[in-house]
């Protein structure tokens, strides 16, 4: 009987291969259908030629790149120690699947423009399935790569739960130490002279600042509230993996607007959407992810969304533009401007 680890490995590999191959086949079939309309409708030669080329591409890439890399990483596990900061599987998905899919999605639109000779007779919106399938497959592959390091069965606490529990212990320990220090000070009234203990107002230490600047997080030990407060780290992987790419998903959906895909605005929207997806190549705990999130997504999206709003109106949500602007400004302020003297004054008030 197969072990649970082997079953998990087989299921994960099959899901990843499906996410790697299916988007390319779907996009290429859509391109073949659009291209066939430019030819004789009774003949399917061009259609089947393009479909067969897409199948051949997936087969060649899988046999020459995907399978060898997968086998090498599985057999030579020590190679993971030499790979720092990025993930080979996600690199293959982005370069070999996502990039061709985006290119042929643009090609489908161009072929439709060639068929109709005018943009006025084009469909009102682009089909959402192909592009959504590409991004969903990429996110699913990312989730699988994260779940490899977690067991499928059993219960695992969320990291945030552990942080709250640790913070509570630290707060209890701090209060106990303060009470003990107050007792020692009261027991020794013969302290140092005022000239030795006096400090100027600007020389207050960090311990003088109140520790509890906000409301405390509740903790439920039993009952229905404990059941409702359960958070498993594996479920949160699914949640945050989709939330992380919601901005890119919204930007890609803008490409389906008739005022975008019927004009040259389609190119910058797809280009910067693909650039933002490059962040998925890096490991989840990479220290460069915050900076890359600004450089590859938020900052470019500010200019793209602002240009779209100025040229075409509010076809992209203003909330998305506000998010990109605020995230970019907050990153620059808290990471760089606060290092200057004018922004580095110590705050005595917790409010």
From Swiss-Prot:
Transmembrane keyword on record: yes
Record membrane topology: Multi-pass membrane protein
Superkingdom per UniProt: Eukaryota
Tissues in which the UniProt entry reports expression: Intestine.
Location in or out of the cell: Membrane
Keyword Membrane attributed: yes
Chief location bin: membrane
Entry GO terms, CC: membrane
Annotated glycan sites: 116
Keywords from the UniProt entry: Glycoprotein, Membrane, Transmembrane, Transmembrane helix
Record-annotated membrane-spanning stretches: 9-29, 49-69, 88-108, 121-141, 264-284, 301-321
PANTHER family from the UniProt entry: TRANSMEMBRANE PROTEIN 236 (PTHR31453:SF2)
Annotated family: Belongs to the TMEM236 family.
Protein name per UniProt: Transmembrane protein 236
Organism in which the protein naturally occurs: Oryctolagus cuniculus
Upper lineage: Eukaryota, Metazoa, Chordata, Craniata, Vertebrata
């Amino acid at each position: 009987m197969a072990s649970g680890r082997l079953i998990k490995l087989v299921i994960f590999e099959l899901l990843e291969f499906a996410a790697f191959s299916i988007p390319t086949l779907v996009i290429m079939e859509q391109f073949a259908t659009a291209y066939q309309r430019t030819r004789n409708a009774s003949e399917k030669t061009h259609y089947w030629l393009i479909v067969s080329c897409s199948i051949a591409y997936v087969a060649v890439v899988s046999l020459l790149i995907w399978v060898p890399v997968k086998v090498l990483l599985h057999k030579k596990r020590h190679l993971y120690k030499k790979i720092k900061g990025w993930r080979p599987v996600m690199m293959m998905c982005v370069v070999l699947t996502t990039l061709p899919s985006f290119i042929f999605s643009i090609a489908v639109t161009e072929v439709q423009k060639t068929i109709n000779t005018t943009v006025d007779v084009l469909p009102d919106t682009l089909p959402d399935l192909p592009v959504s399938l590409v991004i969903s497959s990429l996110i699913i592959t990312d989730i699988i790569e994260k779940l490899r390091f977690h067991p499928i069965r059993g219960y695992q606490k969320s990291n945030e739960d552990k942080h709250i529990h640790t913070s509570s212990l630290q707060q209890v320990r701090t209060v106990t130490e303060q009470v003990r220090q107050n007792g020692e000070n009261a027991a020794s009234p013969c302290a140092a002279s005022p000239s030795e203990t006096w400090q100027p107002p600007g020389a207050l230490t960090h311990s003088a600042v109140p520790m509890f600047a906000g409301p405390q997080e509740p903790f439920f030990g039993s009952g229905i509230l404990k059941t409702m407060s359960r958070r498993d780290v594996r479920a949160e992987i699914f949640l945050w993996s989709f939330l992380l790419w919601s901005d890119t998903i919204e930007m890609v959906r803008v490409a389906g607007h008739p005022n975008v895909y019927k004009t040259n605005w389609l190119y910058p929207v797809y280009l910067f959407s693909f650039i933002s997806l490059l962040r998925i190549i890096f490991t989840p705990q990479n220290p460069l992810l915050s900076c890359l999130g600004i450089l590859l997504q938020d900052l470019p999206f500010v200019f793209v969304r602002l240009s779209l709003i100025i040229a075409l109106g509010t076809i992209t949500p203003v909330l998305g533009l506000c998010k990109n602007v605020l995230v970019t400004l907050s990153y620059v302020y808290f990471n760089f401007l606060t290092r200057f003297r004018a922004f580095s004054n110590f705050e005595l008030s917790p409010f």
